[in-house]
From Swiss-Prot:
Classification lineage: Bacteria, Pseudomonadati, Pseudomonadota, Gammaproteobacteria, Aeromonadales
Cofactor(s) the protein needs: Mg(2+)
Catalysis: reaction(s): 1-(5-phospho-beta-D-ribosyl)-ATP + diphosphate = 5-phospho-alpha-D-ribose 1-diphosphate + ATP
Localization of this protein: Cytoplasm
Control of this protein's activity: Feedback inhibited by histidine.
Name this polypeptide is given: ATP phosphoribosyltransferase
Amino acid sequence: METQRLRIAMQKSGRLSQDSQALFKSCGLKINLREQRLIAHVENMPIDILRVRDDDIPGLVMEGVVDLGIIGENVLEEAQLIRASQGLPAQVKTLKQLDFGGCRLSLAVPDDVAYTGPESLAGKRIATSYPGLLKRFFDEKGLNFKSVMLGGSVEVAPRAGLADAICDLVSTGATLEANGLKEVEVIYRSKAVLVQAPNPLNEAKQKLIDKLLPRIQGMQQARESKYIMLHAPKDKLDAITDLLPGAERPTIMQLAGDTNQVALHVVSSETLFWETMEQLKALGASSILVLPIEKMME
C-alpha cells in the first residue's frame, strides 16, 4: 500500500544541506534535522525528509523511491546523461529552480599553460567528476579528449601528473589558485532545483505539493523584493515611480497637514541601490525607508 506521507530527499551534508533546511523552515515545516537520522518526520504536515548523498538523489527520484528531491542541476543532469546511456530511467519533473546552490562547472589548466579555446585541450587528459557533462561539451565542439574519472580532489590531478587539465565545480576560484590552476572556460552553470518523480502521485500527495509550491515561490519573491516607503512631492510622483524597478501600483496616501506631499508605499522586485536612493532624494523624496520582506503571496 502506498504511503500517504510525502517523501522528500535532500543532501545530508554539504553546500545544499543548510539552504534546504532553511527553505523547509521558511515554508512553515516544523522539523528537527539536528540528529544524525536518515529520515526525519515533519511535525505539522505528512512529510518525511530523507537525508542522503547528493549523488543518490536523482536515482531515488527517477525510480520513484521518493516523491521530491532538492538537487543541484549539475548533479541532476550528469545523472540523466549517465543513466540514459545505461538504459535506466532518467526522467524527472522540474518544479522550481531555487535561489541557492549557484555554481559553475569549468575547465581549468595549470597557470603556465596557454589556453586559446577548447581546441587547446584536444587529445589531452582531463580529470573530472562529471564525465557526462564534459563529454557532451566536447562532443558539441567536435573534439576528442581523454577522460580521467576522479571521485574527489580533482584539482590535484595536474600536479600529480594524472591529467593535463581539469573540469570541476568552481565557486570562488580560491581552490584552483591554491593548486596552481586557472579557470579558462565555463561549460555549465547550475543552481539547486526542486524535482518530482515522473509518475503521477496520489491525490493527497499532489495536493500537498500544490500547497508547498506557492510557499516556496513566495519566499523567493520576498528575498528578491523590498518594501519601500517614502514621502514624495505630488508633482514628482511619475518621475519617482519610474525610478523604482519592478514597482507595480504603489499605495499613495495624503500626508496629514501637507497638501503638496504624499506618502508612497511600494514593493520593488529588484535591489534598490544607493544611487537610486540619491536620485529619489534629488527629485524631492524624503524619509526614504527600504525594508526586507519576510513572506509574500500573490
